[in-house]
């Protein structure tokens, strides 16, 4: 693990650092050592770690029964078996997540049961892990292609009593987004051809460059066979607020589900239409997929679409995801992914020269450096202020800011004070309409206990989430700071 982690830290491309997900099945006899791998400070810092947990283990943990680990984990005649206390091992997972934010949990039976690509497991599409942020469960050599649609941009008259969501425009754009993603697959294949051509002209002998060439061969084959895409969203939190709803309420969850259901049906319709024009993905077989739980939900919602899938196939083996969209949300100036706003208003500090006349020193640190504090407003909170007639240029006191937030739809709907259990239930409800997975972090205050983490993880499993991660403030030092 340390070697993989260090290798990832050493890799960079165009200023971007490497990313890595390490995962191990709870059924593996070394699972406990894996769970403890990041408890020592400075260890495995170049990777995210998650445990692949099956339904049998969860049931044993909840009921206090023993659980059998084995190696090989999928063998009918394993070389080694070991009975473990499932409840104690589960409590260790919970404790470590509470203390260090890792490991995350991947509910593996839910992932594989719901996975359309796993209908083709014997053809090389057996899911083995996820991409680094967990939003796309992947088979070997496949690619993680992401596109995010800004949900806030479809709210007409945001933050007013007349606010509504433009479903017609949304469906039009989702339909086009799926086509763009399919074009991106072709672009990727062209780039792979160029890479392989370059390898062929390299001066090294075939024995040296053969390993890299054959790796790209496998990636190209898998990408072309499945044409997997990842159409997703960002700005869910801002969309909910702009509609006059509060994140974490049942009303907001129901509305979000309707949006994601529309997205799923439209993206799949687009993929079917492309199958008619361009051909279905290479290994499509209606008989293999007809009883997949995700497709059966599509059948219940739109019988005609399901019938067309069975008749014409799809251009893409799977279409949807919800990524963290951290950088994307900076560009759109919105909340990220399906997350609530982290804080609508917060303070930042900038270092200043105390000898400058125009400077106001608000803080001096332990080494004597002077800082000026300034208020940062979430952009869509400022939009709410403008719509409701508040002066966005005024320098408000903290008391006035608290009063403004309390009157806004962001009140009690930030990362640290949202109803966390309801947030997990919302993730599970939306997951029913996302064929891949959803990357979510449940942010918690520093003073919560391990029992809450336990409740959240168990609820995530019961709600149908494919994975879950929690982050308790200051669990990993001072990565995040909140100032009153």
Identify the residue ranges that each predicted region occupies.
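Active-site cavity-forming subdomains of large catalytic enzyme subunits
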Residues: 1-171, 186-200, 215-222, 267, ...
């Amino acid at each position: 693990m340390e070697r993989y982690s260090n290798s990832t830290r050493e890799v960079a491309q165009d200023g971007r650092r490497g990313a890595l997900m390490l995962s191990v099945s709870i059924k593996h006899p070394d699972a406990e050592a894996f769970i403890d791998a990041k408890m020592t400070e400075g260890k495995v810092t170049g990777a995210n770690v998650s445990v692949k947990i099956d339904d049998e283990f969860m049931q044993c943990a909840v009921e206090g029964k023993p659980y059998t680990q084995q190696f090989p984990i999928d063998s009918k005649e394993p070389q080694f078996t070991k009975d473990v206390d499932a409840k104690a091992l589960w409590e260790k997972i919970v404790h470590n997540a509470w203390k260090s934010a890792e490991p995350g949990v991947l509910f593996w039976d839910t992932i594989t049961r719901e996975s359309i690509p796993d209908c083709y497991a014997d053809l090389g599409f057996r899911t083995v892990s996820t991409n680094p942020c967990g939003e796309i469960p992947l088979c070997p050599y496949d690619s993680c292609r992401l596109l995010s649609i800004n949900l806030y941009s479809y709210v007409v008259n945001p933050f007013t009593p007349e606010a509504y969501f433009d479903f017609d425009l949304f469906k039009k754009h989702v339909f086009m987004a799926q086509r763009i993603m399919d074009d991106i697959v072709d672009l990727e294949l062209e780039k792979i051809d160029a890479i392989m051509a370059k390898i062929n002209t390299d001066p090294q002998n075939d024995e040296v460059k053969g390993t890299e060439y054959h790796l790209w061969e496998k990636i190209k084959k898998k990408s072309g066979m499945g044409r997997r895409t990842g159409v997703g969203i960002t700005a869910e939190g801002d969309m909910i607020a702009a509609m006059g709803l509060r994140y974490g309420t049942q009303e907001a969850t129901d509305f979000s589900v309707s949006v994601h259901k529309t997205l799923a049906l439209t993206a799949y319709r687009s993929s079917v239409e492309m199958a008619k024009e361009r051909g279905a993905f290479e290994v499509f077989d209606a008989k293999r997929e007809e009883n997949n739980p995700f497709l059966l939900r599509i059948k219940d919602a739109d019988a005609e679409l399901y019938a067309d899938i069975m008749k014409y196939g799809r251009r893409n083996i799977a279409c949807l995801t919800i990524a963290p969209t951290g950088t994307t949300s900076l560009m759109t100036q919105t909340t990220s992914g399906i997350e609530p706003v982290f804080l609508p208003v917060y303070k930042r500090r900038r270092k200043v020269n105390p000898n400058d006349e125009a400077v106001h020193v608000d803080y001096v640190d332990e080494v004597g450096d002077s800082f000026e504090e300034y208020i940062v407003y979430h952009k869509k909170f400022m939009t709410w202020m403008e719509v409701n007639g508040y002066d966005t240029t005024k320098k408000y006191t903290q008391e006035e800011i608290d009063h403004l937030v309390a009157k806004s739809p962001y009140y009690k709907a930030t990362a640290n004070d949202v109803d966390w259990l309801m947030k997990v239930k919302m993730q599970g409800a939306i997951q029913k309409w996302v064929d891949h997975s959803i990357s979510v972090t449940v942010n918690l205050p520093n003073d919560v206990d391990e029992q809450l983490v336990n409740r959240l993880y168990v609820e995530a499993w019961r709600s149908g989430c494919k994975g879950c991660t929690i982050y308790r403030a200051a669990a990993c030092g001072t990565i995040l700071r909140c100032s009153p």
